C-alpha cells in the first residue's frame, strides 16, 4: 500500500521566510529520499538554473491525513548537495554539534495572531477596536476568547505528530495565542517549531482563517508578538553562577546588536520599552523582570539553578538563527569560564 509524504521546506523569501510543501507518493516500506523543486518560484534560484534539492532531515506522523502518511522536514541544498544560502539549519547543526557536551536545552514560546481577512479575530467587523487589554490573557468565555477551535485542533495535531509541544495559552491581545515547544536541543527545538508552524497554517486553512507571525500585528496600545526563548545548559541547571555568566554574555560588546539582527523582522516596532519589552538597542537582565531583555525567573533565583528567558526574539524569527546565536554566545562564555 502506498503512502503520502508531505515534504516541507523553508523558502528564500525576505525579510521573513515562508513555509512551502508538496506531496510525494511512496511505495510501502520506502523511506523518504531526496527530491527536487523549482527554486525560481520560491526565491531560491534564477530561472536559468532553477533546480534545488530537498534533503529530508526529520520525518514525523502526518496528523492531518492520518494513517501511515508522514510529514518530512527538509533542508534546501544546491544541486552539488552544499547548503543553499537560505538554509539556516546547516549552520545551526554545526554549532549544536560543537557544544553538544554542554547539553543545551531550549523552550520556545511561539506567539501568533489569527486573522479573518484583514481583521484580527476578536476585533469588530467594519472597523474599530475591542475593549482594552486586560481580560484576554489566559482568559475564558466567549466575551474574551476567540479562535479556540483552531488552537485546540493544532495542539492535538502537534501531539499526534510526536512534536515536543508543551502547552498553549491565550495571549494579551484578542485573537493572539501562544504555544510552547521544548525542552529540546539546539536543532531539535527549531525543527519541531518549524513543523508546528506548518501544522498551524494547515489547521487554520480548514477554518478559513489565516495565521500571522507579525511582530506588531496591530499598531497602537496592543502587545506585539514574540517568541520568548528559554535556555539552559547542564551547568546552568546545576548552579547559579552559570546563570549569571550566560546572562552577562548576551550583553557583551557587540552581542546585543548581533542577536537582535537575527531575531526577526520588525524588531524595532516590537521592542520599544513598552508592552513588556526592553528597547531593542539596549541590553538588560533581571530577576522576574518582563521589561528586561533577558529575564531570570524568580524560581531560578530561589533554587539557585535553572534557565534564562531571552525575551527579544520576534514571533516571525527563524528559530534556527535564534537557537544557534544563543548556544554559540552562551556556551562559548561558559566554556571560557570553565562552567561546563
Task: Enumerate the language-model features and the residues they cover.
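Glycine-rich, acidic/polar active-site loops that bind/position phosphate-bearing ligands
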Residues: 1-340
Amino acid at each position: 500500500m502506498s503512502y503520502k509524504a508531505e515534504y516541507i521546506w523553508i523558502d528564500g523569501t525576505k525579510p521573513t521566510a515562508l513555509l512551502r510543501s508538496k506531496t510525494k507518493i511512496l511505495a510501502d516500506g520506502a523511506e523518504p529520499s531526496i527530491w527536487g523543486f523549482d527554486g525560481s518560484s520560491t526565491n531560491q534560484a534564477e530561472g536559468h538554473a532553477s533546480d534545488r534539492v530537498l534533503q529530508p532531515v526529520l520525518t514525523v506522523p502526518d496528523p492531518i491525513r492520518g494513517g501511515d502518511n508522514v510529514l518530512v522536514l527538509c533542508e534546501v541544498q544546491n544541486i552539488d548537495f552544499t547548503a543553499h544560502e537560505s538554509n539556516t539549519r546547516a549552520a545551526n547543526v554545526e554549532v549544536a554539534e560543537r557544544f553538544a557536551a554542554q547539553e543545551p536545552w531550549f523552550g520556545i514560546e511561539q506567539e501568533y495572531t489569527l486573522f479573518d481577512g484583514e481583521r484580527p479575530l476578536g476585533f469588530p467587523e467594519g472597523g474599530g477596536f475591542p475593549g482594552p487589554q486586560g481580560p484576554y490573557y489566559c482568559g475564558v468565555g466567549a466575551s474574551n476568547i476567540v479562535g479556540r477551535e483552531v488552537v485546540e485542533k493544532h495542539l492535538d495535531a502537534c501531539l499526534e505528530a510526536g512534536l515536543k509541544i508543551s502547552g498553549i495559552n491565550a495571549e494579551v491581545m484578542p485573537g493572539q495565542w501562544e504555544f510552547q515547544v521544548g525542552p529540546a536541543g539546539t536543532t531539535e527545538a527549531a525543527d519541531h517549531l518549524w513543523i508546528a508552524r506548518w501544522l498551524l497554517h494547515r489547521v487554520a486553512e480548514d477554518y478559513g482563517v489565516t495565521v500571522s507571525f507579525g511582530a506588531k500585528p496591530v499598531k497602537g496600545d496592543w502587545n506585539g508578538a514574540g517568541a520568548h526563548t528559554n535556555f539552559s545548559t547542564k551547568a546552568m541547571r546545576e548552579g547559579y553562577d552559570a546563570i549569571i555568566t550566560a546572562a552577562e554574555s548576551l550583553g557583551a560588546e557587540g552581542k546585543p546588536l548581533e542577536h537582535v539582527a537575527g531575531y526577526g523582522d520588525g524588531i524595532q516596532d516590537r521592542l520599544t520599552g513598552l508592552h513588556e519589552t526592553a528597547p531593542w538597542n539596549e541590553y538588560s537582565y533581571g530577576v522576574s523582570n518582563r521589561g528586561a531583555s533577558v529575564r531570570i525567573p524568580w524560581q531560578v533565583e530561589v533554587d539557585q539553578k535553572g534557565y534564562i528567558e531571552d525575551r527579544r526574539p520576534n514571533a516571525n524569527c527563524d528559530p534556527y538563527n535564534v537557537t544557534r546565536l544563543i548556544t554559540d554566545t552562551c556556551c562559548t562564555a561558559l566554556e571560557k569560564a570553565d562552567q561546563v
